[in-house]
Regions:
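Short catalytic helix/loop segments, enriched in acidic residues and glycine
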Residues: 27-42
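Catalytic-core segments of class I nucleotidyltransferases/pyrophosphorylases
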Residues: 104, 119-123, 153-235
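N-terminal nucleotide-binding beta1-loop-alpha1 segment
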Residues: 1-26, 55, 207
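Residues in the short beta-alpha loop(s) of Rossmann-like NAD(P)-binding domains
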Residues: 38, 60-64
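A short, N-terminal amphipathic alpha-helix
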Residues: 38-55, 69-70
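Structural beta-sheet core signal
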Residues: 10-12, 57-58, 104-105, 130-132, ...
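Short, structured coil segments at secondary-structure junctions
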Residues: 28, 52, 73-74
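Conserved beta-loop-beta/alpha segment of the NTase-like Rossmann-fold superfamily
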Residues: 65-154
């Protein structure tokens, strides 16, 4: 039994500058990088559709017209984030279009090879902010950086998240937050413009849960992850 009265809408933030993989971006858009025959943006939309989500909002930028062009007749809503002011601001832009309520946040620069994480989130949601989490225990984890590391987990309750250390490799065997989540109104009640500090506050309040999935997780948003993704699907 889930905490969903109805399937939530989803948001795909695609307005960022993509500085981590500028060398591979297509027309200035990391979301249009092609992996396994489809753009990362299309992979993300299909994942959400296959999870049963019908209302999808893509947050683009007036400086990234190629995104809008790629989505012509695709059946998704498009809104623009005037400036690249971060993830929380991007989702706020989508909320202006869709209104309040639970929303599934899906970053378009990550891939899950063996599972539909959005479907798992919907099936496990019980009313609290819920994050898709993987254990970095395979060769695939070598392309990850030390961000989003969970340092205390009891059952499925997240109690502590580490600081970001993007210059370090992610520690093998540790749990990592990924680019999928359901944000509830409790997230917005904290009125914090930084998603990491908001998640930490929710964790300290006992209001943050983990959906742990067993899959290879690829961060295509960095050059090493991009190369790994290409080698994975071309092997």
């Amino acid at each position: 039994m889930t905490g969903l009265e109805s399937t939530p809408w989803a948001v795909i933030p695609a307005a960022g500058l993509g500085t981590r993989m500028a060398e591979n971006a297509v027309l200035g858009c990391k979301e249009l990088v092609v992996v396994n025959g489809k753009t990362m943006l299309e992979h993300t939309i299909l994942e959400l559709e296959n999870a049963g989500i019908e209302q999808i909002v893509v947050v683009s930028s007036p400086n990234k017209p190629a995104i809008d062009k790629a989505l012509v007749d695709r059946g998704v809503e498009i809104v623009h984030q005037a400036e690249p002011n971060g993830l929380v601001d991007a989702v706020k832009c989508a909320r202006k279009k869709m209104g309040e309520g639970d929303c599934l946040v899906a970053l378009p620069d990550v891939m899950f090879t063996n599972v539909n994480p959005s479907l798992e989130l919907l099936s496990e949601f019980k009313g609290e902010t819920l994050l898709t989490v993987v254990r970095a225990d395979g060769a695939w984890a070598t392309q990850l950086r030390d961000t989003g590391r969970i340092t205390e987990l009891q059952g499925h309750k997240i109690h502590r998240i580490s600081s970001k250390n993007p210059d370090r490799a992610f520690p093998k065997g540790e749990l990592r937050i990924t680019g999928r989540a359901i944000w509830t109104e409790a997230f917005w009640d904290l009125k914090d413009d930084c998603e990491v500090s908001t998640l930490r506050k929710l964790a300290s309040m006992g209001k943050l849960s983990a959906s742990i999935v067993k899959t290879e997780y690829i961060d295509v948003g960095n050059s090493k992850g991009y190369r790994y993704a290409q080698s994975f699907f071309n092997r």
